């Protein structure tokens, strides 16, 4: 698999005045997000939505942006979207006036091989000072650690693949740190592996 073409595009996400932030994380919509995805995403009241690639029809991003601002990258099927970056660095900052990053996330479509980070993704995360890697591609919801980095795959809210659940993720930023979770797109309930 070739390395991502764009070394880095960076964006800032300011925290709320109380030092918190809620991110919804989706991936692999393949033009067909689950019919209840928007309802369950909106119920989580995210400050922003991250899309980890394989968007398909870019109208998906327009619909998601009705819920919250969207930060998206291109996946391997998104050849029609050259305006989207392959990699996005997201700096979580206190405010627009205080742009020093408190935490840095790296958003990349193909980030892992099984439960392990791909070597080039781990090197990129380290080079850019990221503490966590958010990825998609496999449709497998996953939270783990490798090489000192947190790895989070939200799963897929697109068409069901094999026996995999249809889920999205949330990242809650609090003064105590990050809290990751998965949400069942069909029921809106928290999802945990069987």
Name each model-derived stretch:
Residues 2-99:
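Core catalytic region of metal-dependent phosphoesterases/phosphodiesterases
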Residues 2-22, 89-101, 128, 152-194:
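Binuclear metal-dependent phosphoesterase catalytic core
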Residues 25-27, 48-54, 71-76, 106-109, ...:
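Active-site neighborhood of phospho(di)ester-bond hydrolases with catalytic His/Asp-centered motifs
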Residues 30, 56, 77, 114, ...:
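Residue-level detector of flexible, active-site-proximal loop/helix-junction positions
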Residues 36, 61-63, 83-85, 117-119, ...:
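Short, well-ordered secondary-structure micro-motifs
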Residues 54-59, 80-83, 107-111, 135-141, ...:
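Short C-terminal domain-edge/linker segments immediately following a structured domain
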Residues 71, 113-177:
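Conserved beta-sheet core of the metallophosphoesterase superfamily
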Residues 78-129, 159-162:
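Active-site-proximal segments of metal-dependent phosphoesterases and phosphodiesterases across multiple
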